[in-house]
Amino acid sequence: METSILGYYLFDREEHGLINALNWNKENKSLLKHPDIKDRKTIWTLLKAKGITSNNLQPRDLVDSALSEYIYKDSHQIAYKDTEELNEIVSDSSVLDNRFNFIYYPNIDISAHVFGVGSDQWHEEVGIFEMFIKNLNSTQSKKMYTLITADHGLTNISNENRIHLDYEEDVVVYGDQRSVYINGDETKVKKIFKNVPGRFLNSVEIRHLIGEPTNNLNKRLYPDHCFLVDDGYIIFPKHLKANLVGYHGGITEEEMRVPVIEIINF
């Protein structure tokens, strides 16, 4: 709640409407500098205050994006084009020595989205990642702390369990496709979701799930309702058309599991 980024898609009631939180545009990225959150401290801010320098390595197309500038504020961002270039970067001891290093490695996550968990392409990416870890372990400097992650777990969704919703403009469906936010009249919303396997959350349950809105920006982005889609199902709001194989955003154990590799050498 303190970040105001409540899901994959947000909805600003006052000005910007629907917002893709992964891809802010020229018009809506000003929200990330809103007075309610502009002084928010990140973990990188805390490390910097303690005199601990930190590196944040991530794909080149993510570096300097509005979202990266927001969530990685006060970290030193290093871009890499592909796994080969990442290997070259981490082989340079001057990059990693005596620092806290965070590496975001999304290739496995992307292959799971596009081809599915357990697919040949997914296994291939896992193998490439294993070789990268072996290389990192063999070339690491004497003093380093490195944390590597690749988003969180996914679940494959069969074609027959993909539900396309039909609704009028006075209802807004956003958030994630398995943990759905909705704005609009409750009776209308329940009718729209009546054939979707899952659970409708009331306002009290929503606050237990994502917390209380604590400032004006939170209130602008806070949903009226939430619907948790059952395991194995997914919904498609009107603004999303892409058919992937693997999805996450739900509350199953496999989706909430965050893969993390920790390397300590000092």
Regions flagged by a language model, labelled:
Residues 1-266:
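Feature captures the catalytic ectodomains and active-site-proximal regions of enzymes
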